[in-house]
Amino acid sequence: MPPKFWIIIIVKKIDQQSLENAYRLFESGDIHQIEIGSTKGLQQIHHYLFNGLYEFAGKIREQNISKGHFRFANALYLKEALGKIEQMPEDTFENIINKYVEMNIAHPFLEGNGRSTRIWLDLVLKKHLGKVVNWQNVDKTQYLQAMERSPINDLEIRFLLQANLTDDVNNREIIFKGIEQSYYYEGYEKE
């Protein structure tokens, strides 16, 4: 078998284990120990999802990264940028989405940013608005395109997510289907 095949198998196993960790984060109640809206809280989520899978689990990256033609925040200024993002207000839906978009631009980890940040976003929305995103209703292509355009204009991602808010914040099915959808956005599909 070619080496590429083995890489695909390894990545799929990492995603599968990380997904199980995400389920456990909620089922165990450990989600209630996460610091909401902070960089530390995002690091806690990332560590929980990827501990034992990546040596950098929960650690702020120290190298530059990009996806496609987009370069995320420069590693030299990342901690300063994260400090500014942390201070952003969380009093309205618009402000929360603005903070979410800025955290996505920062992309503090080498891998696993989207999965971690979507959980982080839901915690902020739940705390301040009593709502979460019903991710299972958010189309993958529309979401990824809106996020790609969000550094220029966050209106599209705001409308997309606002149309899929629910106040059923403790519904187990919404939570777990949302986690699965989050992994699907990143290319993982359960067998």
From Swiss-Prot:
SUPFAM superfamilies: Fic-like. The keyword ATP-binding applies. It comes from Haemophilus influenzae (strain ATCC 51907 / DSM 11121 / KW20 / Rd). This is Probable protein adenylyltransferase HI_0977. Probable adenylyltransferase that mediates the addition of adenosine 5'-monophosphate (AMP) to specific residues of target proteins. InterPro entries: Fido (IPR003812), Fido-like_dom_sf (IPR036597). Disulfide bonds: none annotated. Keywords: ATP-binding, Nucleotide-binding, Nucleotidyltransferase, Transferase.
